[in-house]
Structure formats: structure tokens, C-alpha cells
Regions:
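Histidine-acidic metal/acid-base catalytic patches
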Residues: 18, 22-37, 41-58, 83, ...
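Conserved beta-strand positions in the central sheet of alpha/beta enzyme cores
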Residues: 61, 95, 126, 165, ...
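Glycine-rich, proline-tolerant flexible connector loops at the mouths of alpha/beta enzymes
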Residues: 61-83, 132-137
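Active-site-proximal loop/turn and secondary-structure-junction residues that shape catalytic pockets
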Residues: 39-41, 64-66, 99-102, 129-133, ...
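Short glycine-enriched, charge-decorated loop/helix-capping segments at active-site entrances
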Residues: 69-72, 140-141, 237-243
């Protein structure tokens, strides 16, 4: 009888452990992994979908710049078709990246971009970049100008659905880190305006990653995963393989888990290599992050 009781207790304990492990695994994998298609330049839509499946992600951070299959000239017509083709292959497009000069709702294709994304079911639109210049407007005057532009973009978001997102990018970009990007977005409805936080850029000019993500927590909509490093004297940072740069990956993943972040994570894989090599390196990036997630589950 004692043996049976012990066996029952052991079995029950194992079931509880298995349940807890399943819950932790689901929490760790709630984020949706996608890949930035900028460096898949030259591939058509079938080629892009094949690459994404090879990398092991769920979809695309679709580059909608001139020269790509979906671009400002055809986005309202082509993006809904492409989204359907993606869905038929079990893939998704939760984010599009627009041209770097897409910083005004008055630009001729703004309405087309938002309408196309709305019809295609794309949840997030990454804007271009506002650059601070020594001979330009005073910083705070420029902040006011940008916020006026964001008011117009937020109206498009409210009308068509996709959220307007600002990417944290190092250098003299307005919104280069969490504190500065909050100067731009704070006060807007997080339903329509959000932050696209980039681990690499934050690592060279941002706050400690857990602090950085807490600062933008209310507006955090999308993450970019890449690693950067900067040597003394460098004007900017250089992309390196994940785990070789300044990003604290374990703290990043731990913080996102504590925050219950379940949004898209765009693997940027900005390696200046031939497309096939970029695909191979992106696959390694995904494997690297999955490995850390599994370590966290076991710990």
C-alpha cells in the first residue's frame, strides 16, 4: 500500500511539473518571431516566403520600400493579395517597414499605405526617421513639429486600423532611445501610436535594457532583435552576430517575459552578405534566441 501511495505521489508530482513546464514554455514562446525582409532584396514573394520558412519564423516584417515586391506605388493593391498568399502558406505580416523618408502624413502615398495595411490585416506600420541636425530646428521645437505629424498619422491609424510605430535608432535620430522616443509618443493613445524598440541600437546609446523597456512599456508594440557593438572612435555601431555585441540577451528575454510581451519580434539580421548567407545567419539568430528561451525554461 505504501508503495502504491508513493507511486501515486510521484505520478501526481510529475503531472504538476509537466503542467508548469507547459505554461512556462507557452509564456516563453508567446512572442511572434518574424524576419525583416530588407536584406532579402531581389527575391519575389514566393522566394521571400520560402526564405522565412527556412529561417524558422512565423512571418515577415515586410519591407515596403521602392524596389521591393510591395512598395509605395502598389501597396494598396498588392499588400492585401500578398497577405492572403502568406496566410495560405501559414505565414503572417504583423508589421511593414516604410521608406526612411515616410515622416509626414501629407506624403502622397500615406493614405494608400494605411489603407493597404488595414485591408491586409497588418497591425503595425514602422515610420521613417526624423533626424536632428546642428543647423536645424532647436530640439524641443522639432519635438513639437514631430508630435504634430504624429497627430495626423494617429488619425490614419484610427481610420484604417494599423498602429503607427517609431523605431528606436541610434545616432542623431529623434527617438534614439527610450527616453527620447517618449518625448514623441507620450500622451498619444497607445492603441494608435507605439514604440518599436531595437535591442541593438538601445545597447549602444540607450538605457539598460530592462529600464529601457520599462520606460516605453505602455507603448511597446514591436521588438527588433539584433546585436551591435561600437569600438572607441567609431561614429556609429556595427551589426555583429547575436551574442557577440553589447546586448544583454538574457536580461532582455527575462524582462520581456516579466512584462508578458506577446507582440512581434523582428529579426533584423542586417548582415552585409549575399541573400543566401543572410538566410543562413538569420536561421542561426533564431536558433540562438530559442536556445536562450529553453535555458530559461530549464532554469
Amino acid at each position: 500500500l505504501e508503495t502504491k501511495i508513493e507511486s501515486w505521489a510521484t505520478w501526481k508530482s510529475n503531472i504538476v511539473k509537466l503542467r508548469d513546464l507547459t505554461v512556462e514554455k507557452e509564456a516563453a514562446t508567446a512572442m511572434k518571431f518574424i524576419m525583416f525582409t530588407k536584406h532579402l532584396e531581389g527575391l519575389d514573394i514566393p522566394g521571400i516566403m520560402k526564405a522565412l520558412k527556412s529561417v524558422g519564423v512565423e512571418g515577415a516584417d515586410l519591407c515596403t520600400r521602392p524596389g521591393y515586391p510591395v512598395n509605395p506605388d502598389n501597396v494598396d493593391r498588392e499588400l492585401p493579395k500578398v497577405a492572403k498568399r502568406f496566410a495560405d502558406e501559414g505565414l503572417c505580416i504583423p508589421l511593414v517597414t516604410t521608406p526612411g523618408d515616410f515622416i509626414s502624413a501629407d506624403i502622397d502615398y500615406a493614405e494608400r499605405m494605411y489603407a493597404g495595411c488595414g485591408e491586409a490585416g497588418v497591425a503595425n506600420i514602422k515610420l521613417g526617421y526624423w533626424h536632428w541636425r546642428p543647423d536645424g530646428p532647436h530640439y524641443w521645437e522639432y519635438v513639437d513639429t514631430i508630435r504634430k505629424e504624429l497627430e495626423e498619422f494617429s488619425k490614419l491609424s484610427e481610420k484604417y486600423g494599423p498602429k503607427t510605430c517609431i523605431h528606436t535608432h541610434s545616432g542623431r535620430d529623434m527617438g534614439l532611445n527610450s527616453c527620447s522616443v517618449m518625448h514623441l509618443v507620450k500622451g498619444f493613445d497607445p492603441k494608435y501610436v507605439g514604440v518599436f524598440a531595437d535591442t541593438g541600437h538601445l545597447s549602444i546609446c540607450g538605457e539598460p535594457i530592462d529600464m529601457a523597456l520599462d520606460i516605453v512599456k505602455e507603448y511597446l508594440s514591436v521588438m527588433a532583435f539584433k546585436d551591435l557593438m561600437r569600438r572607441p572612435g567609431d561614429r556609429g555601431g556595427g551589426v555583429v552576430r547575436m551574442g557577440k555585441g553589447f546586448v544583454d540577451w538574457k536580461l532582455t528575454l527575462k524582462t520581456l517575459k516579466v512584462m508578458n510581451f506577446d507582440g512581434p519580434v523582428s529579426f533584423h539580421s542586417e548582415y552585409r552578405e549575399p541573400v543566401e548567407t543572410v538566410i543562413d545567419l538569420a536561421r542561426i539568430d533564431v536558433r540562438f534566441i530559442n536556445g536562450l528561451l529553453q535555458e530559461g525554461i530549464r532554469d
